């Protein structure tokens, strides 16, 4: 009975060593699991960005309103006979806003 017990104990030690330190053991599983979580977070950010870009493409393909809005905001374009007014905040309000942004 002693040899069987010794054999089973040796088998148990070998299995535990393989589980903890061997190839595809607990340490490898933990590392791969961390990599998967990080990749899923990156994928979620990229999916949100892609969804935003697809929505913008749909807006631009959908009609003239989106193109007109983009031209007005980004290029400061106006229609013929239209006057463009830019409202500039007071210097004190600009200083307050700059102070809040620096915090």
Swiss-Prot record:
Cell compartment(s), UniProt: Cell inner membrane
Task of the protein: Essential cell division protein. May link together the upstream cell division proteins, which are predominantly cytoplasmic, with the downstream cell division proteins, which are predominantly periplasmic.
Protein name per the record: Cell division protein FtsB
Keyword Cell inner membrane: yes
Segments crossing the lipid bilayer: 4-21
Family: Belongs to the FtsB family.
Membrane topology listed for this record: Single-pass type II membrane protein
Designated gene of the protein: ftsB
Assembly and binders: Part of a complex composed of FtsB, FtsL and FtsQ.
Domain of life: Bacteria
Stretches of the chain forming a coiled coil according to its record: 33-62
Periplasmic side: 22-103
Lineage: Bacteria, Pseudomonadati, Pseudomonadota, Gammaproteobacteria, Enterobacterales
InterPro entries: Cell_div_FtsB, FtsL/DivIC
One GO cellular component, as annotated: cell division site
